[in-house]
Structure formats: structure tokens, C-alpha cells
Amino acid sequence: MESRHPLDHLIAAADRALRAVFAPAHASRPVPAALTEPNEGNVPRPRGSCDTESRQQDRGDSDQSLPAVKLSDAERLQSAALMRVNHAGEIAAQALYHGQALVARSDATRDLLLSAAKEESDHLAWCEARLKELGSRTSLLNPLWYCGSFAIGVLAAATGDRTSLGFVVETERQVEGHLDEHLMRLPSGDTRSRAILDQMRTDEIGHGAAAKAAGGTQLPAPISALMRHAARVMTTAAYWI
């Protein structure tokens, strides 16, 4: 395989950054559907009984087969705030992986990181679509989240691929915890957001397992604690801004 010039990696990283922060996200998978969907008789029917073709018409936009949930104003604001936090978290995750991939020492590690980042793009698109449905927006601080996480990714990868992959394991473990919390805090009737977060959680667990299997090492406790504090700052700010 022909090796790429370092400048090529830098240009690609800049392109990924601009797309992640400023361009509309495009998903390679449909927006996850709720487990049950009401039919005209208002009788729940199993997921998968809806029109398959309609699911695949536009893989980057909201899936119209999802239930039309009527939320109160307070519930809508709560769901929107939580989905904005999740979107900001996906921006940060993309930046972390992009920064790590930029200085990864092996092609295998770089490929694993970019593959995970690609799935995070699906998460971005899903969260964006849901925020639009809720009449809300993404965090105004997304450029800040991206820059900070990208720098952390570069620093993590500079210590070696095994430590870099350990950051992925720890990041995904913490993200899983955040998603568990948000699933409990979502309004009970918001099945659309819940379906999205359920699939995101499944993907994040897979990313962490893949990084661990690839040789990711356990991070020192102080580093894990620092990551938790940084995440708390981001989630608190993104909830409101």
C-alpha cells in the first residue's frame, strides 16, 4: 500500500473538522425507529412492519415511520436539551478520533479510529434531525468542543497507539454512562429520541470493545477522573448553550 504524505493526513483532518462542525451531517444508516409504531387503528405494530421503501428514501433525514409523539412544552424543552448534549458529545467524539487518527502510528489503528468516527457521523445526523423535529438547535459551542477534543486526541495518540486506544475505551465507557442517564431522564413518551439513544449506546459499546480488543490499555485513574470532569463541563454548558 502506498504511504500518504503527512501533509495529506493534515489536509484530510482539516476537511473532516470543517464538515463535522459546520456542514449538515449525513447518515449512512436510517434514523432508528421506535420498538412499536402506531397504525391507523392506533394499535401498536411490530417494528419492521412499516414500509421498508419509505425508510430508505432519505437516509440522512428523520424517519417518517417513527411515531408522531405529542410532548408538552416542558417535555419538548427537556428532550431538546438532552439531545443537544448528545449531539455535542458526538462532536467531541469525532474530534477525539480525528485527532488520534492524525498521529496514529499504525494504519490499523488509524483505520479503526476513522471507522468509529464514521459511525459517530450517523449519530450526529440522527441528533440533528431530532433537534429539528423538536424545534431546537445544536450547541453554539460546538467549535470549542471540537478544538478541545481534537487537541486531546492528538496528545493521547502521541503517547502511542495502545494508550490512544485506551482513551477510546474510557471515552466510550463514559459515553455509555451518559446515555444511560439520559435514557432515564427523557420524557416517557419521547420514543423517537429514546430509539436514537438506544442505537447510539449499542454503537458506543461496540467501539469500546473494538478498541480494547485492538490492544487498548487501561488509563490511570487520575486521567479517567480528569476526562469525567471535562465531560461534565461540556454537558452542563451544552444543555443550555
Regions found by a protein language model. Name each.
Residues 1-241:
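Non-heme di-metal
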